[in-house]
Amino acid sequence: MNDRVFEQTMNQNHQDGGARECVLEARGVTKTFVQGGFNVQVLDNAQVSVRRGEKLAIVGASGSGKSTLLHVLGGLDEPSAGQVSLLGKPFTQLAERERNELRNRALGFVYQFHHLLPEFTALDNVAMPLRIRRMSTEEARRHAREMLEQVGLGARAKHRPGELSGGERQRVAIARALVTKPACVLADEPTGNLDGSTADHVFHLMLELSRTLDTSFVIVTHDPDLAARCDRILRLRDGVLHEEPAVPV
């Protein structure tokens, strides 16, 4: 069974498994910026509900507001109106410290560019979120090593980012996002800087990790073939999210 057939089977099993708890939800989210003295509405009454273990793709034209949506979903930016809840807790009802603690505990982030610290090894880059939580160096490295094994890079733990390929660096970034065992990972064009075959491998890895770790993924991508491998697709057009029908791959 090839990767895509396997993914399609697992997606169908997931969809047939009934409703699961909602880990991330946006209700009536609107985001407006002021540009050149004019109000520009990027998000218009956006509604998003992400279930545990679900893979949700967000697609849309360049400049349509996909990254803005991820920032709002991740509590990195506040909506002009509406509400975002993480594990049932609305960000707007939390003090800044509580919001940061919840975000750091329950969310992981992956970007188009890996943002690894060049002076640290792959192992210590992955361990960094745990060290920020004041976990001991020894324990943090143990968890980081286990996660590197899961992304197939156990043998590269002592290498620095400059000694890794583009695909390997992105796999380290994925391991870093998952090492805290978040409920949901927000990924902004995670394969956009990779060649076709490497992008395909990295995307498959994310979907497989979502299944094995029961972690939700919200993935912004411009690639319709990759988006079709997720459980659901939402298209952002003129600030409004539209759900698209699943198309077998």
Swiss-Prot record:
InterPro entries linked to this entry: AAA+_ATPase, ABC_transporter-like_ATP-bd, ABC_transporter-like_CS, ABC_transpr_LolD-like, LolD_lipo_ATP-bd, MacB-like_ATP-bd, P-loop_NTPase
GO molecular function: ATP binding; ATP hydrolysis activity; transmembrane transporter activity
Membrane topology: Peripheral membrane protein
Subcellular location field: Cell inner membrane
Disulfide bonds: none
GO biological process terms, semicolon-separated: lipoprotein localization to outer membrane; protein localization to outer membrane
GO annotation, cellular component aspect: plasma membrane
Keyword Chloroplast: no
Residues that hold ATP according to the record: G60, A61, S62, G63, S64, G65, K66, S67
Record's function text: Part of the ABC transporter complex LolCDE involved in the translocation of mature outer membrane-directed lipoproteins, from the inner membrane to the periplasmic chaperone, LolA. Responsible for the formation of the LolA-lipoprotein complex in an ATP-dependent manner.
Subunit structure: The complex is composed of two ATP-binding proteins (LolD) and two transmembrane proteins (LolC and LolE).
Similarity comment: Belongs to the ABC transporter superfamily. Lipoprotein translocase (TC 3.A.1.125) family.
Protein name: Lipoprotein-releasing system ATP-binding protein LolD
Biological source species: Burkholderia mallei (strain ATCC 23344)
Recorded name of the encoding gene: lolD
